[in-house]
Swiss-Prot record:
Main function: Involved in maintenance of ploidy through proteasome dependent degradation of CDK inhibitor rum1 and S-phase initiator cdc18. Functions as a recognition factor for rum1 and cdc18, which are subsequently ubiquitinated and targeted to the 26S proteasome for degradation. Together with pop2, required for cig2 instability during G2 and M phase and cig2 degradation in exponentially growing cells. Regulates cell-cycle progression under starvation through the rum1 protein.
Keywords, alphabetical: Nucleus, Repeat, Ubl conjugation pathway, WD repeat
SMART domains given in the database record: FBOX, WD40
Protein name (database record): WD repeat-containing protein pop1
WD repeats mapped onto the chain: 444-472, 484-538, 575-603, 615-645, 657-687
Listed InterPro entries: F-box-like_dom_sf, F-box_dom, G-protein_beta_WD-40_rep, WD40/YVTN_repeat-like_dom_sf, WD40_repeat_CS, WD40_repeat_dom_sf, WD40_rpt
Species of provenance: Schizosaccharomyces pombe (strain 972 / ATCC 24843) (Fission yeast)
Organismal lineage: Eukaryota, Fungi, Dikarya, Ascomycota, Taphrinomycotina
Length: 775
């Protein structure tokens, strides 16, 4: 035997009818592949020990046991020959070849020598001087099978790590004339073998077959095409047979392609990958996407402590949190089960708890919803309201209807069903909010109606006829008439006592009015008049029988006669020396603003004047209360806004900025807004923490009336109804234009109503920003 290169596997055909054939393994790097455990065998190891599995390794994959692989050396050319198994399909043969080349390559390992059938053992041993040498090793990657039928055997012998060598199944039916020997050539680490096909014994000519041989019983007698790998150079070349498919040829090039790809520059790699992907089918690209997607997904939130995760989430706005919740189930739980997160976002966005939120909370508790679900629902109510107003479509649903026979509109109040308007006349008109149809007119007063307020179906009105009247809005019937004032009634308020709940939620407590012993007073009516007095009346129930006043002469209705003749009369608050323009109330506290330049703080349950607030120069036109801080805020003709402590009566702060009469000041949701008459003509938004003016909403023609909440201001000037973003101070849009004057403005969650003068006629304009159901 010629000496071969070290660590190569050589197989020598020893049959006298064959020429010498040497099979040489390709140079495959297997340094990273796990080595099988190898045990040394004695030359005297019996065939029984091998066949019974003593010191023999486990089974190789079944698909590899059906693969035919042959190595050949002709002259200086070294090659590897792969022969198709005709019992398998082309696809299965291709998969086997891929497995051989890339999965189980372990060619440079010693292999096992086995005994041959007794008839041929002696002949073969004579021709193998080095057979069964002391250096024989067993590769435990292979399984040996033996089936006994008399003295004849079907035996499976190991070959390289790629396949098994075995006798055909029909060996038992004929005289066994095949010889297969395996010997280990120690110096060259090579194995020699020979094999005769039994189905060719009848011929003098012997045909060399690659292993494993095919059964003679097979109906496929066609030769299978070999694929030759050329390993004669450092870069192996491929010599495909004329009948080899292009797919197998491409598979054999993969090793070289992969090796070359790793050496390419990054830009060339990207170029090559682009063209490869563009030539892939849809399913292949989907599988690649599944592999790549987890690489670029970083679930960093799961690696943080809960405190850090919450801190990260608190820096996101509502749309971002909604996007986060859609990333995964885990992130959805982080967002949807964190009550503190939604509370923080609620306050950060400048929202405030109101009575509707309390109703939502009660409804959710009845449905057994979690605290987080309640807070989330309340937040999105406020968020959607703001978005609906500030980002409304260009065309808003609008309804206009005229008001006939009036000279002036003194007050407007509405809900989703009705709009109530008082005019400078004894008449009070009630319209349908959706259609503008006049529902009814109330005409019991004998003088002009200047003020009113309603709660539910109870309407209370004040007039220049110096009476307070209580109406049933369901029927339009006047239920009660209260006498006592001696001049025009300028202001009416209905106080229903302390309506705060027992809930301890921090968000609610931030905006809830203080108690002030309101439970000691039943629901009552406040009426203030130009007669310098404030009168308190119990709020009648609509089912109470009408009170008949025995003495309708107002001059004779003093405190004594009212107390004895009117069961609804409570008391009169005296102290002001001029007309009481406006009153504000908080539970048991009443704050009155007068033209005498003072404000007075009263205790309603006792009638005691707690404080006289002096500081304004001139008339006080407007007053409002900050319930969370126990403060009242006033403004008047001196163009100053003053902030007072209700408990001590101390002047806390004076806000400067307006240059003319401040006709209106309102406090809502922790935001203070004031309006000044011409030539100032500005709305100012104030920061109560610093006393500075946060924004100036300038209108050339001045603001006559306005209303605001946590997100917006709706103001009416002489010719335009405008919508402002209170957070930025910017004008969002003009809601109405080309008007003569705007007298009154009011809005709720979904609807804005304005009383305007256009072309010398009075109109009610209704603008709809959403439905009640959407709220």
């Amino acid at each position: 035997m010629n000496e071969k290169k070290k660590d190569s596997l050589s197989v020598l055909d020893s049959n006298e009818f064959f020429g010498e054939t040497t099979m040489v393994s390709p140079s495959i790097d297997v340094s990273s592949s796990p080595r099988p455990n190898v045990e040394r065998f004695s030359p005297c190891s019996t065939k029984k020990d091998l066949l019974e599995g003593n010191n023999i390794m486990t089974r190789i994959p079944e698909e590899l046991s059906r693969v035919s692989l042959q190595f050949d050396s002709k002259g200086s050319q070294q090659s590897m020959i792969f022969t198709n198994n005709r019992c398998l399909s082309d696809k299965e043969n291709l998969e086997n070849l891929q497995n051989l080349l890339y999965l189980h390559c372990d060619l440079n390992r010693p292999h096992l020598s086995c005994e041959l059938p007794s008839e041929h053992r002696e002949k073969c041993l004579k021709r193998r001087n080095s057979s069964l040498s002391s250096n024989l090793h067993a590769n435990k990657r292979f399984l040996f099978n033996s089936q006994s039928d008399g003295n004849k055997k079907n035996e499976t012998f190991p070959s390289t790590n790629y396949s098994n060598v075995f006798y055909p199944n029909n060996c038992d039916s004929k005289e066994v004339a095949s010889e297969t020997t395996f010997s280990l050539d120690a110096p060259n680490n090579s194995v020699n073998y020979s094999y005769f096909s039994p189905n060719l014994l009848g011929n003098d000519s012997k045909t060399r077959q690659s292993f494993p041989p095919h059964s003679s019983s097979s109906s496929h007698n066609s030769l299978h095409e070999p694929v030759i790998y050329d390993f004669s150079s450092e870069n192996p070349s491929i010599h495909p047979s004329n009948h080899l498919s292009s797919q197998k040829n491409a598979v054999l090039k993969l090793a070289q392609l992969i090796s070359s790809f790793e050496k390419l520059p990054e830009s060339v790699r990207q170029y090559l990958l682009f063209h490869l992907l563009s030539r892939c089918g849809k399913h292949a690209v989907q599988n690649i996407h599944k592999i790549l997607l987890p690489i670029f997904q970083k679930n960093f939130l799961t690696g943080f402590p809960a405190e850090i995760t919450n801190l990260v989430l608190t820096h996101l706005d509502a749309p971002s949190l909604c996007a986060v919740s859609q990333v995964s189930h885990h992130w959805y739980k982080l967002v949807s089960s964190n009550e503190e997160l939604w509370k923080s976002l609620f306050l950060k966005d400048g929202f405030f708890w109101d009575s509707i939120d309390s109703k939502i909370r009660t409804m959710c508790l009845e449905q057994s919803l979690s605290a987080c679900a309640i807070m989330k629902r309340v937040y999105f109510r406020h968020f959607n309201l703001r978005e609906r107003w500030l980002h409304a479509p260009e065309k808003i649903k609008r309804c206009s209807f005229p008001i006939h026979g009036v000279r002036l509109i003194t007050k407007l109040q509405f809900d989703d069903d009705k709009i109530i308007v008082s005019t400078c006349s004894p008449r009070i008109n009630i319209y349908d909010t959706k259609t503008g149809v006049l529902i009814r007119s109330l005409e019991e007063h004998e003088g002009d109606v200047w003020t009113f307020e309603y709660v539910g179906d109870t309407l209370v009105t004040g007039s220049t006829d110096r009476t307070v009247r209580v109406w049933d809005l369901r029927t339009g019937e006047c239920k009660q008439v209260f006498y006592g004032h001696t001049s025009t009634i300028r202001c009416i308020k209905i106080v229903q006592g302390n309506q705060s709940t027992t809930d301890t939620d921090d968000v609610e407590k931030e905006n809830r009015p203080a108690s002030n012993d309101a439970n000691s007073m039943p629901p009552y009516i406040i009426s203030s008049s130009r007669d310098c007095t404030i009168r308190l009346w119990s709020l009648p129930c609509l089912d109470d029988p009408p009170f008949v006043n025995v003495n309708e002469n107002p001059d004779q209705n003093n405190d004594f006669t009212s107390a004895t003749t009117n069961p609804f009369y409570i008391r009169t608050l005296r102290g002001h020396t001029d007309s009481v323009r406006e009153v504000a109330c908080l539970g048991d506290l009443i704050v009155s603003a007068s033209y005498d330049g003072t404000l007075r703080v009263w205790k309603a349950s006792t009638g005691v004047c707690l404080h006289v607030l002096r500081g304004h120069v001139g008339r006080v036109y407007s007053v409002t209360i900050n319930p969370s801080r126990q403060q009242c805020i006033s403004a008047g003709t001196d163009a100053k806004i003053r902030i007072w402590n209700l408990e001590s009566g101390e002047l806390l702060q004076t806000l400067h900025g307006h240059s003319n009469l401040v006709s209106q000041v309102t406090f809502n949701q922790n935001i203070l807004v004031s309006a000044s008459a011409p030539p100032d003509t500005s709305l100012r938004v104030w920061d109560l923490n610093t006393g500075s003016c946060r924004d100036i909403l300038k209108c050339p023609l001045g603001h006559i009336f306005f209303q605001h909440d946590e997100s917006k201001v709706v103001s009416g000037s002489h010719s335009t109804l405008q919508l402002w973003d209170i957070r930025s101070g910017k004008l969002v849009r003009d809601l109405l234009t080309d008007l003569d004057i705007i007298w009154q403005v009011a809005y709720n969650e979904n609807v804005c109503v304005a009383a305007v003068l256009r072309n010398n006629r009075f109109w009610i304009e209704v603008l709809e920003f959403g439905s009640t159901k959407s709220s």
